[in-house]
């Protein structure tokens, strides 16, 4: 990434604020947000601390949970708004493939009450390979709702705060850097943990 930045790794933050004026142009500040599942929520608090310290953020880079927090921050969500959003979500529903009860027919409602989760079966009762236990459609829907206004394919450098996120091509193991595209899709691809969430198919990948 060609960011002339001072990188701050959230979660391993050591902030030193100098009040003495420095000669020359201000150094660019970039925030790197790692993964870590639920622990990734700590990134929200880290962003709040950085803001309260008066440190301007010029770039945001994230992976997995960090890509979600970073992506939302890059389009204007404040740490307070993200904290409130996280607290009011039904995570047991989001981290499943359950259809909202209001959209289920009678058979689907009965099945959802009987089973915690299900796997697709093919011929001879063999489970079909799905790439992960969770398709993540409910999360994808949430990301789409939260990124209204940014559904087109865009250059992430042109977001209110330039953003990038990282994923992996499960076919060849190569790193995939997202600097453009559909923001919600990039966030979903970055959090596609092999064996847990099904991968996101993008173009020829």
Spans of model-derived segments:
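Bacterial Sec-dependent N-terminal signal peptides
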Residues: 1-26
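Patatin-like phospholipase
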Residues: 20-63, 71-205
